[in-house]
């Protein structure tokens, strides 16, 4: 058993959560490393990182440790040497429990100022050296200025270790107390807490006078790197994350989950006030505000608990003009300033009973554990979420329209009501929207839908006001994820003259919008809704790069809309693309443009593409992207051209094998054969099946051949079922 005995009661808990033992470096000259082989310090926490790690008065002093097994105060055969690290803790390897380590006062001496036990106490047990922890990957970092105080496994055992086994490296599961899993504790813990224990919680805290790690006090004395922590007085409780013993410091009692509206602290009477003031006693990393991220609820001691967030100035956003409220959407009242409301709780006194007055601004918004700003809410919005049975109208939310617009369910409520609202109700809601920054609302994830509804259901005056807000910002809105939707809706519902004014702001930014994941939708909507004569600046920008944009993930969409809607310019666009058809057919995005030409192009355009397909039928049919074009070609060509494809597949060979057999076994070309079966007349289909059916046994061996077999069987069943019907008609 390994027992930690803290030699410095004032040593602070400064070990970080998931780092090794990074002691502050010190010059070699300032350290006395003599006699390290006799008594070596353990890797326990030192003083605070912000303070000096070494004390000059302690470095130069001599320390006396007794030999022998006598546990009384007699000092026999003392060995004196200089300890360079007086704040470290020594380990005992004799297997005794902490209770057997009795501390007794030491008589004053001349060099008492260097005693590593300032309280006048020292251990009576002999302290053999720690051995061979150097190779342990968990404990392997030491100051560069210090000699590594560990014996290698290959080294011979010194005389001071003659009484120990030759291989004394302890298992990781036995280090630093009683750990019951392979995860172990990465960091030794002094476990000497300045706090008084919580009532009935001796399994978690220790006495202020004795550092203990035995099973009597800590069945598992650390939760670092462990999923389960077993309190002595309760059944095992599941913890989703890791923390350590002292992480009960900033937990506040609340009852949010149960919906209760009161805050009643229920701490035990012995709860020390210093516990609430302490930031973290654990080895887990802390947030910037000092709170530990691993504070967890413990139902065995506390009915409901939550982390107290830190009050922080409001973030810079359009919500600055909105009412300030607390963490969970309830504004604090100003009528009773002395009332203290714990963050994350809902006092009954602030809940409205019958009125829906606007929220009164209170303290700045709170910051949650992830550093995100809490959405500021009003009383009405809270009741809207809390009371699902109440029937709300637009008149009930007046004064809170912007807040509702930026809320998911509130925005949906406004959208539904605006579709059937009266003109007066729409105007009242619109006045609140227009009085704020509409641009910010247009770029909001939920607010943009409310603005869109006013382009759809609003009157001309309201549309003009919104257009005045958009003017000068069309390009920036077009590149924004939610703002581009508002611009599209505006183009769709405003008058033609306003459409031209709006889209003219994109002159000089056409290619920027075309190649943007959001802006390309605005260009598409403009091509769909605005006359081609007013879009010449767009077509001029597209024409020199039209074959390049056709292979662009966003540009290909714009080219398809141009081919579909720009009738006067369609011929010029296709003529620019025809020399690049074969390359575009094999492109991941360009193949969609070629398919669009087959669907909307002239017969001469289709004929040109078909001739290219028939010349490279096998290659294109086995291509991942080009096979889509071949399938589309089969659907849109004439029966005569389709017969040409069938004859080529049946008659020609490649690599001493029929093209049909190669295509049936290919993972892409087999879909071309299936498409040919679907699109061909019955006579040609039966001919194709007659060539496929003899190879059914071979196709069963291929994964993709099985799909074709299913199609063949389906058509054969149709043919068989059709024969009796013809026979019955002949008999009649």
UniProtKB/Swiss-Prot annotation:
- Gene Ontology molecular function: CCR4-NOT complex binding; exoribonuclease activator activity; mRNA 3'-UTR binding
Q: Which UniProt keywords apply?
A: Cytoplasm, Membrane, Mitochondrion, Mitochondrion outer membrane, Repeat, RNA-binding
Query: CDD domains under this entry?
Result: Pumilio
The segment annotated Disordered runs over 98-123
The residue ranges flagged as biased composition, category Polar residues, are 100-109
Q: What induces it?
A: By stress.
Q: How does it sit in the membrane?
A: Peripheral membrane protein
Residues in domain PUM-HD?
376-716
- What subcellular locations does the record give? Mitochondrion outer membrane; Cytoplasm
Q: What is this protein called?
A: mRNA-binding protein puf3
Whose protein is this, by species? Schizosaccharomyces pombe (strain 972 / ATCC 24843)
Protein encoded by which gene:
puf3
């Amino acid at each position: 058993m390994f027992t930690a005995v803290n030699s410095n009661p004032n040593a602070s808990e400064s070990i970080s959560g998931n780092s090794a033992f990074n002691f502050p470096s010190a010059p070699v000259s300032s350290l006395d490393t003599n006699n390290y082989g006799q008594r070596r310090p353990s890797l326990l926490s030192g003083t605070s990182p912000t303070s000096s790690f070494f004390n000059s008065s302690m470095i130069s002093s001599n320390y006396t440790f007794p030999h022998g097994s006598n546990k009384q105060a007699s000092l026999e055969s003392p060995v004196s040497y200089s300890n360079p690290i007086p704040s470290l803790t020594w380990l005992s390897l004799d297997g005794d429990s902490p209770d057997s380590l009795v501390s007794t006062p030491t008589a004053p001496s001349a060099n008492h100022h260097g005693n590593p036990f300032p309280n006048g106490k020292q251990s009576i047990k002999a302290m053999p050296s720690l051995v061979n922890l150097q190779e342990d990957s968990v404990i392997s970092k030491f100051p560069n200025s210090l000699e590594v105080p560990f014996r290698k496994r290959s080294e011979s055992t010194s005389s001071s270790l003659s009484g120990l086994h030759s291989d004394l490296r302890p298992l990781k599961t036995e280090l630093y107390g009683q750990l019951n899993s392979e995860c172990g504790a990465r960091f030794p813990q002094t476990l000497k807490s300045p706090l008084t224990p919580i009532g009935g919680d001796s399994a978690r805290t220790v006495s202020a006078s004795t550092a203990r790690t035995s099973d009597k006090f800590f069945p598992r004395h650390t939760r670092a790197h462990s999923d389960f922590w077993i309190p002595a007085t309760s059944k095992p409780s599941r913890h989703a994350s890791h923390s350590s013993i002292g992480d009960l410091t900033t937990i506040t009692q609340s009852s949010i989950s149960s919906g209760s509206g009161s805050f009643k602290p229920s701490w035990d009477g012995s709860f020390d006030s210093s516990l609430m003031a302490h930031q973290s006693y654990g080895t887990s990393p802390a947030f910037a505000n000092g709170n530990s991220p691993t504070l967890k609820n413990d139902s065995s001691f506390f009915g409901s608990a939550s982390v107290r967030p830190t009050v922080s100035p409001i973030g810079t956003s359009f919500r600055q003009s909105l009412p300030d409220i607390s963490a969970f959407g309830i504004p604090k009242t100003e009528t009773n300033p002395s009332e203290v409301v714990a963050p994350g709780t809902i006092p009954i006194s602030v809940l409205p009973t019958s009125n829906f007055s606007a929220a009164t601004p209170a303290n700045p918004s709170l910051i949650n554990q992830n550093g995100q700003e809490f959405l500021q809410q009003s009383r009405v919005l809270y009741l809207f979420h809390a009371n699902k049975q109440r029937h709300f109208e637009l008149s009930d939310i007046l004064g809170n329209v912007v807040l509702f617009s930026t809320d998911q369910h509130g925005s949906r409520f406004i959208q539904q009501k605006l579709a059937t609202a009266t003109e007066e109700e729409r105007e009242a809601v619109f006045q609140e929207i227009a009085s704020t920054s509409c641009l910010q609302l247009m770029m909001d994830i939920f607010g943009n839908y409310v603005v869109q509804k006013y382009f759809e259901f609003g009157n001309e005056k309201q549309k003009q006001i919104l257009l005045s807000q958009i003017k000068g910002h069309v390009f920036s809105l077009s590149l924004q994820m939610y703002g581009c939707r508002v611009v599209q809706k505006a183009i769709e519902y405003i008058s033609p003259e306003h459409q031209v004014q709006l889209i003219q702001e994109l002159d000089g930014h056409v290619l920027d919008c075309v190649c943007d994941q959001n802006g390309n939708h605005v260009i598409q909507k403009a091509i769909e809704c605005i006359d081609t004569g007013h879009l010449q600046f767009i077509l001029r920008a597209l024409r020199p790069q039209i074959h390049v944009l056709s292979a662009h993930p966003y540009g290909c969409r714009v080219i398809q809309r141009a081919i579909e809607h720009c009738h006067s310019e369609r011929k010029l666009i296709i003529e620019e693309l025809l020399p690049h058809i074969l390359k575009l057919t094999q492109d991941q995005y360009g193949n969609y443009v070629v398919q669009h030409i087959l669907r909307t192009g002239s017969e001469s355009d289709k004929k040109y593409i078909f001739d290219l397909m028939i010349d490279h039928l096998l290659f294109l049919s086995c291509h991942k992207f080009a096979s889509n074009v071949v399938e589309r070609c089969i659907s849109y060509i004439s029966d005569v051209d389709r017969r040409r494809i069938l004859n080529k597949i049946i008659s020609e060979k490649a690599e001493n094998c029929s093209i049909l057999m190669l295509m049936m076994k290919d993972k892409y070309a087999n879909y071309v054969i299936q498409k040919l079966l679907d699109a061909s007349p019955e006579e040609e289909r039966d001919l194709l099946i007659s060539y496929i059916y003899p190879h059914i046994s071979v196709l069963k061996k291929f994964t993709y051949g099985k799909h074709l077999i299913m199609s063949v069987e389906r058509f054969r069943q149709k043919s068989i079922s059709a024969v009796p019907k013809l026979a019955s008609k002949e008999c009649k």
